[in-house]
Regions:
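Short, conserved beta-strand element in jelly-roll/cupin
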Residues: 38-42, 51-67, 105
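Short acidic-glycine-tyrosine-enriched beta hairpin
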Residues: 72-86
Length: 118
């Protein structure tokens, strides 16, 4: 068994305005097959349209988000779970007044966020 990794001990990255992201579990942290991370989206901000080569499970812990998956928009209110299949275009917009907090899971350690045109 490995030691617990506290989310607060992992440094934040800001790949886009209003977006905070961090990888909590990855190959670099000893995982052989799973990637786990945290995503925080400020009110009014959007994680741009993108795709992954593997499926992604999104656990919405707080906030209200509009999620677009392959052109279909859905309102997601925490607490909720959403699955985006491999190769599916998706983006997430915070439509509430408080931060959207998501924990994401990939069944792989080789994961890439590929931005696509909207």
């Amino acid at each position: 068994m490995s030691e617990p990794i506290r989310f607060t001990d992992v440094p934040d990255a800001s790949p886009f305005p209003g977006i905070i992201s961090k990888l909590v579990m990855s190959r670099e942290k000893g995982s052989a097959a799973i990637t786990v991370g945290e995503l925080r989206i400020a009110a009014g901000h959007t994680l741009p349209l993108h795709v992954h080569k593997v499926e992604e499970a999104l656990v919405f812990l707080s906030g209200d988000a509009k999620v677009e998956v392959d052109g279909k928009e859905t309102l997601v209110t925490a607490p909720s779970v959403l699955l985006t299949p491999a190769g599916t275009k998706h983006c997430i917009t915070n439509v509430g007044t408080s931060e959207v907090r998501i924990v994401f899971f990939f069944p792989a350690v080789e994961v890439e966020r590929i931005l696509v045109e909207h």
